[in-house]
Amino acid sequence: MTSYLWFLLAAVFEIAGCYAFWMWLRLDRSAWWIAPGLLSLVLFALILTRVEASFAGRAYAAYGGVYIVASLAWLALIEKTRPMLSDWLGAALCLAGAAIILFAPRLHTS
């Protein structure tokens, strides 16, 4: 269960870090946005190592579903744009895939 919390926290920092660069490069905001963006992305990387997984690639793949849902929440809460039904349907499919990756029985460790 703690992996979900780490995934969610990682998503917040990754999205915030990327959004800081979006602010600078796409919305013509100050280059000072780079500093919090870099800090946020470093925290994202550190936090993602806390996930209970034997292999990095599997952790990243499972995290992808959480990232997509968190991105849609960011769209709604920060950018004040309502996600469309197709956004939520796509996110649901991705979460299903992430759940399969996360919960599938492991017959082999490689």
From Swiss-Prot:
<comment type="similarity">
    <text>Belongs to the UPF0060 family.</text>
</comment>
<feature type="transmembrane region" description="Helical">
    <location>
        <begin position="31"/>
        <end position="51"/>
    </location>
</feature>
<keyword id="KW-1133">Transmembrane helix</keyword>
<dbReference type="InterPro" id="IPR003844">
    <property type="entry name" value="UPF0060"/>
</dbReference>
<keyword id="KW-1003">Cell membrane</keyword>
<keyword id="KW-0812">Transmembrane</keyword>
<feature type="transmembrane region" description="Helical">
    <location>
        <begin position="84"/>
        <end position="104"/>
    </location>
</feature>
<feature type="transmembrane region" description="Helical">
    <location>
        <begin position="59"/>
        <end position="79"/>
    </location>
</feature>
<keyword id="KW-0472">Membrane</keyword>
<keyword id="KW-0997">Cell inner membrane</keyword>
<feature type="transmembrane region" description="Helical">
    <location>
        <begin position="5"/>
        <end position="25"/>
    </location>
</feature>
<dbReference type="GO" id="GO:0005886">
    <property type="term" value="C:plasma membrane"/>
</dbReference>
<protein>
    <recommendedName>
        <fullName>UPF0060 membrane protein Pmen_1247</fullName>
    </recommendedName>
</protein>
<dbReference type="Pfam" id="PF02694">
    <property type="entry name" value="UPF0060"/>
</dbReference>
